[in-house]
Amino acid sequence: MIDAAAEEKISACLDTSGYGDTKALLKLAKKETVTNILFDIKSVDDDIHRAYTGVSNALILENLRALCSEARIREKITLRMPLIKDVNDGMELIERTAALYKAQKLKKVDLLPYHNLGIGKQRNIGGTQKEFEKPSEEHLTEIAEFFKNFAKMEVGIYGRA
C-alpha cells in the first residue's frame, strides 16, 4: 500500500507496534513517502510487557533502536504510550522510559490514557477483556511535564475525555 501511495505522490504514515522483522521495518521507514512513523511502546519493562501483551519487548526495543540509528528516520517518529493506571504509569517506569527516549534522541511522545471502548465489542463476540482504569488528570500532567523537562520532548495527551 505504501508503494501504491508513493506512485500517486501521497504521503503515508507507518503505524507500528515495532513487533516485526527489523529489515522490513527499516525498508518501509526509509521510503520518502513515509513522512510519519507512529511507534507504540506499551512498556519498557519486559516483565510488564510480557504480562499484558504475551510477548517480550526485546524485539520492539531493538527495532526502535534500529530506526533511531538513522537521523532521517528518527525525525519521523512519534512514540505513542498507552497508559494504564497502576500498570505502566508509575514514575520509576516513566523515568526509565524517558531515559530510553532521550538516549535515542527522540523528540515526540503522545500519551494515550486507557479507554474501555473495546470492551463492549469483546463481550458482543463472546470474548472477555480485563477492565483497567486510566491515570488521573493530575498524574497525566505530571507524566507529560516529566517528558518535557527531562527528555526535552514535545508531548501530546489524547483521549482524555
Model-flagged regions — what are they?
Residues 1-112, 117:
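Conserved AdoMet/S-adenosylmethionine-binding subsite of the radical SAM
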Residues 85-161:
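Auxiliary Fe-S-binding modules of radical SAM enzymes
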